[in-house]
Amino acid sequence: MSTNICSFKDRCVSILCCKFCKQVLSSRGMKAVLLADTEIDLFSTDIPPTNAVDFTGRCYFTKICKCKLKDIACLKCGNIVGYHVIVPCSSCLPSCNNGHFWMFHSQAVYDINRLDSTGVNILLWGNLPEIEESTDEDVLNISAEECIR
């Protein structure tokens, strides 16, 4: 997906947790909207979530666009929490987008604003280090209380 048209560096980074079981799914979440229908709010991430979600079901296409999608489910509780864009379609690819292919339904996850290294300011995408995704709570330094709030 193209990111040269729009800038997302001032967007807040979120920790995404499953609403059903409170499992941390990603430490690199961003609030987003569906390209094909901007009335639909979502969350997205740029790195495949490891040890948190897995594919479920078959690939499918929507009526709105021709992107090839596959649902993802929380590994802890099994509920579908979003989908992965396997192949973006020719109409979505050139659109203003954040380049993320991992999408989370706002009805299935909740977000917690991630703080920067000072622990005071909200971390912005422009300041986010490019590291490999991990959902290990020790690595993320997230307390259970913070994820439950």
UniProtKB/Swiss-Prot annotation:
Source organism, top-level taxon: Eukaryota
Alphabetized InterPro entries for the sequence: YPEH2ZP (IPR026768)
Any matching Pfam family: YPEH2ZP
GO cellular component terms, A-Z: cytosol; intracellular membrane-bounded organelle
Disulfide bond sites: none
Remaining remarks: Highly homologous to GCUD2 but localized to a distinct locus.
Family (UniProt): Belongs to the FAM72 family.
Protein name as annotated: Protein FAM72B
Organism in which the protein naturally occurs: Homo sapiens (Human)
